[in-house]
Amino acid sequence: MRLRHSSGILGLALTMLLVPAMPSFTHAQVIKSGPPSCPGVALTFDLCPVRTGVGYDQALIDYLIEQKIPATFFMSGNWMTRHDEQVRALLQIPFFEVGTHGEVHAHLPLHSADEQKQEILGPVRLLKTKYGHDATLFRPPYGEFNDDTVNVARALGLQFILWNVESGDPDPTLTAIRIEDRLKQLVRKGSVIVMHANGKGRHTHEVVQDLHQHLLPERNLTPMTMSDLLTCAQAAP
C-alpha cells in the first residue's frame, strides 16, 4: 500500500486553460498523523473486499474488544453489504470508530470528480440510511488521491485520513517479527498506523498484541481512536 497523490501535467495544463482552477489540497486537509506532542497512537484498520476468505479477522476484533483497545475502522461499501452482522457489531463498541473507504475500493485518480463523488458517497449513505451512523472520516483506497478526491471529501464534510506508519501487514513475505521491527522504527507520538482487519494481514493479530503489550507501553503511548488523536492535547508535565 502506498500513498499516491496524482496530478498529470498535461491534464492540469488543459484544465487551467478551460475552466477556473480548483484550489489545490493543503497539508491541513490531508491528515497523516496527530499532533506530535500527543502521547497517543491511532490504530486504524481497513475493511475492504477480499477475493478469498471470510473478509473479517474475528480473532483480532475479539482481542481489541477484550483488551478495550480503541481502534478506527475504514469500511468500503462493498465490504459492508457482505458483512452486515459485523458492521452492526463494530458500531456497538463504544471505543471503536467507523469511517469509510470508498464503495468498491476503486483507484480514485483514474475517475472524474463526479465519479469520485459517487464512489466516496456510497458507503456514507449506506452507514446513514441502514445503520443510522453519520460518517465523518474517509480514507481513499490504496492511499491514492488527487485534488478532486480531496475537494469532494471536503465538500461532503469528511476528514481526509491517511497514515504515516505503514505496517505492511498484507505483504505475504513479511513475518510478524519484521512487521514489529518496522513499527519499532516508525511509531512515535501522534502516529497513525494502517493495518487490515479483513484477514489480508496474516500476522495482524499477533502484531497488535505486541503493540499493546510491549511497544506502546514501553514508549508511554496510548492507543486512541482517530478522532481522539486529532483532538489530543499534550499530556501535563
Predicted regions: what is each one?
Residues 1-12:
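Bacterial N-terminal signal peptides that target proteins for export
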Residues 25-100, 104-107, 115, 119-126, ...:
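Active-site beta->alpha N-cap acidic-glycine motif
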Residues 48, 76-78, 103, 141-143, ...:
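Active-site beta-loop-alpha junctions enriched in small/polar residues
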Residues 62-74, 97, 113-146, 151, ...:
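CE4/NodB-like, metal-dependent polysaccharide N-deacetylase domain
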Residues 105-111, 169, 195:
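A short acidic, helix-capping loop that chelates divalent metal ions and anchors anionic groups
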Residues 144, 150-186, 221-233:
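His/Asp/Glu-enriched short active-site or ligand-binding loop at hydrolase and phosphoryl-transfer sites
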